[in-house]
Protein backbone atom coordinates (compact mmCIF):
# COMPACT_ATOMS: atom_id res chain seq x y z
CA UNK A 1 0.00 0.00 0.00
CA UNK A 2 1.13 3.57 -0.65
CA UNK A 3 1.87 6.08 2.06
CA UNK A 4 3.07 3.62 4.68
CA UNK A 5 3.83 5.16 8.09
CA UNK A 6 7.37 5.31 9.45
CA UNK A 7 6.21 3.23 12.42
CA UNK A 8 7.74 -0.26 12.33
CA UNK A 9 5.86 -2.90 14.32
CA UNK A 10 8.24 -5.28 16.07
CA UNK A 11 8.29 -9.00 15.28
CA UNK A 12 5.52 -8.58 12.70
CA UNK A 13 6.44 -11.63 10.61
CA UNK A 14 6.71 -13.79 13.72
CA UNK A 15 3.37 -12.53 15.06
CA UNK A 16 1.57 -13.36 11.81
CA UNK A 17 3.17 -16.80 11.54
CA UNK A 18 2.72 -17.86 15.16
CA UNK A 19 -0.85 -16.57 15.38
CA UNK A 20 -1.57 -18.56 12.23
CA UNK A 21 -3.33 -15.62 10.58
CA UNK A 22 -5.46 -16.86 7.70
CA UNK A 23 -8.40 -15.61 5.63
CA UNK A 24 -11.64 -14.85 7.44
CA UNK A 25 -10.25 -14.66 10.97
CA UNK A 26 -11.64 -12.42 13.71
CA UNK A 27 -8.66 -10.72 15.32
CA UNK A 28 -8.38 -8.71 18.53
CA UNK A 29 -5.54 -6.18 18.67
CA UNK A 30 -5.74 -5.13 22.31
CA UNK A 31 -3.07 -2.42 21.94
CA UNK A 32 -3.45 -1.22 18.37
CA UNK A 33 -1.02 1.70 18.75
CA UNK A 34 -0.28 3.17 15.33
CA UNK A 35 -1.82 0.16 13.59
CA UNK A 36 1.29 -1.56 12.26
CA UNK A 37 0.50 -5.05 13.53
CA UNK A 38 -3.19 -4.69 12.63
CA UNK A 39 -2.30 -3.70 9.08
CA UNK A 40 -0.02 -6.69 8.68
CA UNK A 41 -2.61 -9.08 10.08
CA UNK A 42 -5.35 -7.64 7.86
CA UNK A 43 -3.18 -8.19 4.81
CA UNK A 44 -2.55 -11.79 5.88
CA UNK A 45 -6.24 -12.40 6.70
CA UNK A 46 -7.44 -11.45 3.23
CA UNK A 47 -10.67 -9.74 2.26
CA UNK A 48 -12.84 -11.42 4.90
CA UNK A 49 -10.54 -10.94 7.89
CA UNK A 50 -11.58 -8.45 10.56
CA UNK A 51 -9.72 -6.58 13.30
CA UNK A 52 -11.11 -5.07 16.47
CA UNK A 53 -8.43 -2.64 17.68
CA UNK A 54 -8.26 -1.09 21.15
CA UNK A 55 -6.08 1.65 22.62
CA UNK A 56 -6.53 4.14 25.43
CA UNK A 57 -4.33 6.74 23.72
CA UNK A 58 -6.54 9.06 21.66
CA UNK A 59 -3.68 10.35 19.50
CA UNK A 60 -2.40 6.88 18.67
CA UNK A 61 -5.91 5.70 17.82
CA UNK A 62 -6.39 8.68 15.52
CA UNK A 63 -3.18 7.84 13.66
CA UNK A 64 -4.16 4.18 13.46
CA UNK A 65 -7.49 5.22 12.00
CA UNK A 66 -5.73 7.12 9.21
CA UNK A 67 -3.45 4.25 8.26
CA UNK A 68 -6.14 1.59 8.54
CA UNK A 69 -8.82 3.59 6.70
CA UNK A 70 -8.27 1.72 3.38
CA UNK A 71 -9.53 -1.46 5.06
CA UNK A 72 -12.95 0.09 5.62
CA UNK A 73 -15.42 -1.82 7.77
CA UNK A 74 -12.96 -4.68 8.24
CA UNK A 75 -11.54 -2.57 11.08
CA UNK A 76 -13.25 -1.21 14.16
CA UNK A 77 -11.26 0.96 16.58
CA UNK A 78 -12.31 1.65 20.17
CA UNK A 79 -10.65 3.93 22.72
CA UNK A 80 -10.44 1.88 25.88
CA UNK A 81 -8.03 -0.06 28.06
CA UNK A 82 -6.92 -3.51 26.92
CA UNK A 83 -8.32 -5.01 30.13
CA UNK A 84 -11.82 -3.99 29.06
CA UNK A 85 -11.79 -6.01 25.86
CA UNK A 86 -14.55 -8.45 26.97
CA UNK A 87 -17.12 -5.64 27.03
CA UNK A 88 -15.97 -4.40 23.61
CA UNK A 89 -16.25 -7.91 22.14
CA UNK A 90 -19.77 -8.22 23.53
CA UNK A 91 -20.77 -4.87 22.06
CA UNK A 92 -19.38 -5.90 18.68
CA UNK A 93 -21.23 -9.21 18.82
CA UNK A 94 -18.02 -11.21 18.83
CA UNK A 95 -18.44 -14.17 21.18
CA UNK A 96 -14.94 -15.51 20.46
CA UNK A 97 -11.87 -14.41 18.52
CA UNK A 98 -9.50 -16.50 16.42
CA UNK A 99 -6.40 -14.51 17.33
CA UNK A 100 -5.48 -11.91 19.93
CA UNK A 101 -2.42 -9.70 20.25
CA UNK A 102 -1.17 -7.44 23.03
CA UNK A 103 1.96 -5.35 22.44
CA UNK A 104 3.08 -3.87 25.77
CA UNK A 105 5.54 -1.44 24.19
CA UNK A 106 5.41 2.32 23.66
CA UNK A 107 4.95 3.94 20.26
CA UNK A 108 7.32 6.51 18.79
CA UNK A 109 4.37 8.92 18.72
CA UNK A 110 4.22 8.77 22.51
CA UNK A 111 7.95 8.76 23.19
CA UNK A 112 8.84 11.59 20.81
CA UNK A 113 6.22 14.10 22.00
CA UNK A 114 7.73 16.14 24.87
CA UNK A 115 4.25 17.27 25.96
CA UNK A 116 3.41 13.68 26.92
CA UNK A 117 6.28 13.51 29.40
CA UNK A 118 7.38 9.95 28.64
CA UNK A 119 10.99 10.84 27.84
CA UNK A 120 13.61 13.42 28.70
CA UNK A 121 15.48 14.09 25.45
CA UNK A 122 13.36 17.24 25.23
CA UNK A 123 11.92 19.06 28.23
CA UNK A 124 8.21 18.78 28.90
CA UNK A 125 5.60 18.41 31.65
CA UNK A 126 5.72 15.32 33.86
CA UNK A 127 2.50 13.70 32.68
CA UNK A 128 3.10 10.14 31.37
CA UNK A 129 -0.61 9.22 31.15
CA UNK A 130 -1.50 7.15 28.10
CA UNK A 131 -5.15 8.16 28.41
CA UNK A 132 -4.87 11.72 29.71
CA UNK A 133 -8.52 12.42 28.89
CA UNK A 134 -9.55 9.90 31.54
CA UNK A 135 -7.86 11.87 34.32
CA UNK A 136 -5.95 9.98 36.97
CA UNK A 137 -2.60 10.45 38.64
CA UNK A 138 0.22 12.04 36.66
CA UNK A 139 3.92 11.39 37.07
CA UNK A 140 4.22 14.89 38.52
CA UNK A 141 1.71 14.05 41.21
CA UNK A 142 3.45 10.79 41.96
CA UNK A 143 6.92 12.35 42.15
CA UNK A 144 5.83 15.20 44.40
CA UNK A 145 3.31 13.48 46.66
CA UNK A 146 4.30 9.83 47.04
CA UNK A 147 6.15 8.80 50.18
CA UNK A 148 9.81 7.88 50.08
CA UNK A 149 8.84 4.24 50.65
CA UNK A 150 6.42 4.19 47.71
CA UNK A 151 8.86 5.93 45.35
CA UNK A 152 11.59 3.51 46.35
CA UNK A 153 9.31 0.52 45.78
CA UNK A 154 8.17 1.78 42.36
CA UNK A 155 11.69 2.50 41.11
CA UNK A 156 13.08 -0.76 42.49
CA UNK A 157 10.24 -2.99 41.29
CA UNK A 158 9.28 -1.46 37.95
CA UNK A 159 12.65 0.05 37.06
CA UNK A 160 14.74 -2.73 38.61
CA UNK A 161 17.22 0.00 39.55
CA UNK A 162 19.80 -0.87 42.25
CA UNK A 163 20.02 2.84 43.09
CA UNK A 164 16.29 3.11 43.88
CA UNK A 165 16.89 4.20 47.47
CA UNK A 166 19.30 6.96 46.51
CA UNK A 167 17.00 8.20 43.76
CA UNK A 168 13.93 8.25 46.02
CA UNK A 169 15.85 10.12 48.72
CA UNK A 170 17.07 12.68 46.18
CA UNK A 171 13.55 13.26 44.86
CA UNK A 172 12.16 13.78 48.37
CA UNK A 173 15.02 16.14 49.25
CA UNK A 174 14.59 18.30 46.15
CA UNK A 175 10.79 18.49 46.32
CA UNK A 176 10.97 19.82 49.88
CA UNK A 177 12.48 22.98 48.37
CA UNK A 178 10.58 23.14 45.07
CA UNK A 179 8.17 20.95 43.12
CA UNK A 180 9.61 18.77 40.37
CA UNK A 181 7.39 19.57 37.39
CA UNK A 182 9.36 18.85 34.20
CA UNK A 183 11.05 15.87 32.61
CA UNK A 184 14.40 17.66 32.38
CA UNK A 185 14.36 18.53 36.08
CA UNK A 186 13.54 14.97 37.11
CA UNK A 187 16.26 13.59 34.84
CA UNK A 188 18.73 16.01 36.43
CA UNK A 189 17.73 14.94 39.95
CA UNK A 190 18.21 11.27 39.09
CA UNK A 191 21.54 12.00 37.38
CA UNK A 192 22.84 13.76 40.47
CA UNK A 193 21.61 10.93 42.71
CA UNK A 194 23.74 8.36 40.92
CA UNK A 195 27.31 7.80 42.17
CA UNK A 196 29.85 9.42 39.84
CA UNK A 197 31.50 6.08 39.04
CA UNK A 198 28.14 4.67 37.94
CA UNK A 199 27.44 7.67 35.72
CA UNK A 200 30.84 7.33 34.07
CA UNK A 201 30.28 3.70 33.07
CA UNK A 202 26.51 3.68 32.45
CA UNK A 203 25.39 2.36 29.05
CA UNK A 204 22.21 4.44 29.24
CA UNK A 205 21.15 7.61 31.01
CA UNK A 206 20.61 6.87 34.72
CA UNK A 207 17.09 8.34 34.52
CA UNK A 208 15.91 5.81 31.93
CA UNK A 209 14.82 3.21 34.48
CA UNK A 210 13.16 5.78 36.74
CA UNK A 211 11.09 7.13 33.84
CA UNK A 212 10.09 3.59 32.88
CA UNK A 213 9.09 2.81 36.46
CA UNK A 214 6.98 5.94 36.85
CA UNK A 215 5.26 5.35 33.50
CA UNK A 216 4.38 1.78 34.47
CA UNK A 217 3.01 2.96 37.82
CA UNK A 218 0.99 5.86 36.40
CA UNK A 219 -0.64 3.65 33.76
CA UNK A 220 -1.00 0.53 35.93
CA UNK A 221 0.64 -1.43 33.14
CA UNK A 222 1.23 -4.69 35.00
CA UNK A 223 -2.33 -4.72 36.35
CA UNK A 224 -3.64 -4.14 32.81
CA UNK A 225 -1.53 -6.98 31.44
CA UNK A 226 -2.56 -9.31 34.24
CA UNK A 227 -6.27 -8.58 33.68
CA UNK A 228 -5.90 -9.25 29.94
CA UNK A 229 -4.09 -12.54 30.53
CA UNK A 230 -6.71 -13.69 33.02
CA UNK A 231 -9.65 -12.97 30.71
CA UNK A 232 -8.36 -13.93 27.27
CA UNK A 233 -8.73 -17.76 27.49
CA UNK A 234 -12.50 -17.33 27.91
CA UNK A 235 -12.69 -15.37 24.66
CA UNK A 236 -10.55 -17.48 22.34
CA UNK A 237 -12.24 -19.91 19.98
CA UNK A 238 -10.89 -23.48 20.18
CA UNK A 239 -7.62 -23.41 18.28
CA UNK A 240 -7.50 -19.63 18.61
CA UNK A 241 -4.17 -18.13 19.62
CA UNK A 242 -2.96 -15.29 21.82
CA UNK A 243 0.36 -13.49 21.40
CA UNK A 244 1.95 -11.07 23.84
CA UNK A 245 4.97 -8.87 23.12
CA UNK A 246 6.72 -7.58 26.23
CA UNK A 247 9.70 -5.27 26.66
CA UNK A 248 10.36 -5.62 30.38
CA UNK A 249 11.44 -8.64 32.43
CA UNK A 250 8.53 -8.17 34.85
CA UNK A 251 6.06 -8.26 31.97
CA UNK A 252 7.67 -11.32 30.41
CA UNK A 253 7.64 -13.22 33.71
CA UNK A 254 3.97 -12.35 34.16
CA UNK A 255 3.12 -13.70 30.70
CA UNK A 256 5.21 -16.83 31.26
CA UNK A 257 3.49 -17.59 34.58
CA UNK A 258 0.00 -16.92 33.21
CA UNK A 259 0.50 -19.15 30.18
CA UNK A 260 2.04 -21.89 32.32
CA UNK A 261 -0.88 -21.80 34.78
CA UNK A 262 -3.42 -22.06 31.95
CA UNK A 263 -1.46 -24.92 30.37
CA UNK A 264 -1.57 -26.97 33.61
CA UNK A 265 -4.38 -29.27 34.73
CA UNK A 266 -3.88 -28.82 38.46
CA UNK A 267 -2.72 -25.61 40.12
CA UNK A 268 -3.07 -26.78 43.74
CA UNK A 269 -0.12 -26.08 46.08
CA UNK A 270 2.58 -28.77 45.81
CA UNK A 271 1.89 -29.99 49.34
CA UNK A 272 -1.72 -30.77 48.34
CA UNK A 273 -1.74 -34.56 47.80
CA UNK A 274 -5.18 -34.72 46.15
CA UNK A 275 -6.29 -32.13 43.61
CA UNK A 276 -9.14 -29.99 44.90
CA UNK A 277 -8.86 -27.02 42.53
CA UNK A 278 -10.66 -28.66 39.62
CA UNK A 279 -8.57 -26.62 37.20
CA UNK A 280 -8.13 -27.97 33.69
CA UNK A 281 -5.64 -26.76 31.10
CA UNK A 282 -7.13 -24.32 28.60
CA UNK A 283 -4.00 -23.31 26.70
CA UNK A 284 -1.14 -25.02 24.92
CA UNK A 285 2.11 -23.06 24.93
CA UNK A 286 3.60 -22.71 21.43
CA UNK A 287 6.78 -20.87 22.43
CA UNK A 288 8.86 -22.77 24.99
CA UNK A 289 11.20 -19.78 25.05
CA UNK A 290 10.32 -16.22 24.06
CA UNK A 291 10.84 -15.36 20.40
CA UNK A 292 13.18 -12.40 19.91
CA UNK A 293 14.07 -10.21 16.96
CA UNK A 294 16.90 -11.20 14.67
CA UNK A 295 20.00 -9.11 14.05
CA UNK A 296 18.61 -7.61 10.84
CA UNK A 297 15.42 -6.35 12.52
CA UNK A 298 17.38 -4.94 15.47
CA UNK A 299 19.65 -3.06 13.06
CA UNK A 300 16.61 -1.66 11.29
CA UNK A 301 14.61 -0.98 14.46
CA UNK A 302 16.58 -0.68 17.71
CA UNK A 303 13.33 -0.79 19.68
CA UNK A 304 13.03 -4.47 18.78
CA UNK A 305 16.15 -5.39 20.77
CA UNK A 306 14.31 -5.97 24.05
CA UNK A 307 11.07 -7.35 22.59
CA UNK A 308 9.99 -10.85 23.66
CA UNK A 309 7.09 -12.70 22.05
CA UNK A 310 5.17 -15.55 23.68
CA UNK A 311 2.24 -17.37 22.06
CA UNK A 312 -0.32 -19.90 23.30
CA UNK A 313 -3.22 -21.77 21.70
CA UNK A 314 -6.71 -22.38 23.11
CA UNK A 315 -7.51 -26.03 23.71
CA UNK A 316 -11.00 -27.44 23.12
CA UNK A 317 -13.23 -27.22 26.18
CA UNK A 318 -13.37 -30.30 28.38
CA UNK A 319 -15.91 -32.73 26.98
CA UNK A 320 -15.92 -31.12 23.54
CA UNK A 321 -16.00 -33.41 20.54
CA UNK A 322 -12.48 -33.33 19.10
CA UNK A 323 -12.81 -36.41 16.89
CA UNK A 324 -11.95 -35.97 13.25
Swiss-Prot record:
Domain of life: Bacteria
Sites where the protein binds S-adenosyl-L-methionine: 35-37, 55, 85, 103, 110
Cellular compartment(s): Cytoplasm
Record keywords, A-Z: Cytoplasm, Methyltransferase, rRNA processing, S-adenosyl-L-methionine, Transferase
Known catalytic reactions: cytidine(1402) in 16S rRNA + S-adenosyl-L-methionine = N(4)-methylcytidine(1402) in 16S rRNA + S-adenosyl-L-homocysteine + H(+)
GO biological process per UniProt: rRNA base methylation
Gene3D superfamilies named among the record's database cross-references: Putative methyltransferase TM0872, insert domain (1.10.150.170), Vaccinia Virus protein VP39 (3.40.50.150)
A GO cellular-component term linked to this record: cytoplasm
A GO term for molecular function: rRNA (cytosine-N4-)-methyltransferase activity
EC assignment: 2.1.1.199
HAMAP family per record: 16SrRNA_methyltr_H
General function of this protein: Specifically methylates the N4 position of cytidine in position 1402 (C1402) of 16S rRNA.
Family membership: Belongs to the methyltransferase superfamily. RsmH family.
Protein name: Ribosomal RNA small subunit methyltransferase H
Organism for this UniProt entry: Solidesulfovibrio magneticus (strain ATCC 700980 / DSM 13731 / RS-1) (Desulfovibrio magneticus)
Gene giving rise to this polypeptide: rsmH
Amino acid sequence: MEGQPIHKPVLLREVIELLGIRPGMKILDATVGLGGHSRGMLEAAGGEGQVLGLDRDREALSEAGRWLAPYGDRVRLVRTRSSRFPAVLAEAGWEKVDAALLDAGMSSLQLDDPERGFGFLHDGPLDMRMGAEDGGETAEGLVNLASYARLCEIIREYGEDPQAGRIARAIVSVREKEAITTTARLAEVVWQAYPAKWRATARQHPATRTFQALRMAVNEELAELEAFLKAIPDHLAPGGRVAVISFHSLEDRLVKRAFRAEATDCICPREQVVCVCGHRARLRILTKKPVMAGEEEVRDNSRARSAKLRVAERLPDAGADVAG
